[in-house]
Amino acid sequence: MSDKLWGGRFTAKAAEWVDEFGASIHFDQKMAAEDIEGSIAHAKMLGKQGIISPEESEKIVSGLKIINEELIAGKIEFDVKNEDIHMNIESLLTEKIGPVAGKLHTARSRNDQVATDFHLWVKHRLPHVLESLTELQEELLTLATTHAGTIMSGYTHLQHAQPITYGHYLLAYFEMFQRDYERFEFNQKHTDILPLGAAALAGTTFPIDREFVASELGFDSIYHNSLDAVSDRDFALEFLSNAAILMMHLSRMAEELILWSTYEFNYIELSDDFSTGSSIMPQKKNADFAELVRGKTGRSYGALMGLLTTMKSLPLAYNKDMQEDKEQVFDIMDTVLASVKVFTGMLSGLTVHKERMLATTQDDFSNATELADYLATKGVPFREAHAIVGQLVLTGIQSKTPLQKMSLSDLQAVAPQIEEDIYDKLQSETAVNRRTSLGGTAVENVKKEIVRNKKVLEAR
């Protein structure tokens, strides 16, 4: 006969290596605190509803609290023979209080139990993600305030495009992380639903009180379909999807930190705290931590695709495949929290080379659009103006003369509409500050956006 808690209808024991293959305790032990938390609420409900006696309920709750204390103290050792965290906790409870521990599983299945544990685990940690994002956004605003007027080249196709301010650049990432914050906030809504009470898949005949359990565990709502309750992993997929998008945003900025800290760019320098050296080249200062964040982004994509693939063909309700839903979430939760923390630290110690940033806008022809716009205001059709300025740029490249250093007579030879006032408009600072349209890079705009974004954070 099988020695499993569920082994009544089995006549033989599985080989030890088979038990090892089927066990999940090596990773789902991370949910031990949540399993105990859910079981305490369930035991209280069973006693309240008269499904077990008040004395039995109290004995079970007391035993679970002792196990939790031992867990916190690091005194608990889990056994792979008990398969998963649920069976391990129940086995420990039986050792402490005897056969009455077997009554804890009344009106409950491991199907709704594990779903509850998983919901609780994610629910407990999403606030930490939101807090870490807020800290990152605060650091971005601090840096943007300092550099609201720091002029640099803006890029498209990694080629100089138009001058912008570094503060404007930083606020672009603030907006991205704001969307990330809002996605994780919405993720909380779908995580904050109680599965417990669905039992295996069809509900239970016992007179349970799911509202009581939801209140005890702090859930905002309850699943209204027992099949959905034990089958749903959307909340985990949403977390992984949100995490993948967040990591993509971090990776994009990491790429720029890496590029801009090179000798060729020299726009920024990362602090020694977030750099490493070479074992052979003494001069090296590598942006390893930014590179690691960039590398871990692929890991987050893999986790999302892994769980999507696991879930894609599963018939209702629970299937053992769903045991594979947790490791990715556990890993990516740690990855996200660590990556955001590292990024916040990197930004706080960043040195910005303002003079170098400005210098790259002086001879890169990124003011060409200013000249085309100028001609358009003089009545020249923009397409014609575009062609005229393109010719001037080619001439300037060949003669190594920036537009703002060409003589007025040379400019007028190509476009007689050009007057002396063009030289001010071709200055990087003027070009930046004329971009006053909503969302534009003008310093005045950047400062207004900083104020607006500070209010966004204060409202949290």
Swiss-Prot record:
Q: Where in the cell is it found?
A: Cytoplasm
Matching entries from Gene3D superfamilies are given as: Fumarase/aspartase (C-terminal domain), Fumarase/aspartase (Central domain), Fumarase/aspartase (N-terminal domain)
Whichever gene encodes this chain, its name is: argH
Subcellular location, principal: cytoplasm
Q: Does the keyword RNA-binding apply?
A: no
Under the GO molecular function aspect, what terms does this record hold?
Answer: argininosuccinate lyase activity
Q: What is the lineage of its organism?
A: Bacteria, Bacillati, Bacillota, Bacilli, Lactobacillales
Q: In which pathway does it act?
A: Amino-acid biosynthesis; L-arginine biosynthesis; L-arginine from L-ornithine and carbamoyl phosphate: step 3/3
Q: Which Pfam families match?
A: ASL_C2 (PF14698), Lyase_1 (PF00206)
Its domain of life reads Bacteria
The identity of this protein, by name, is Argininosuccinate lyase
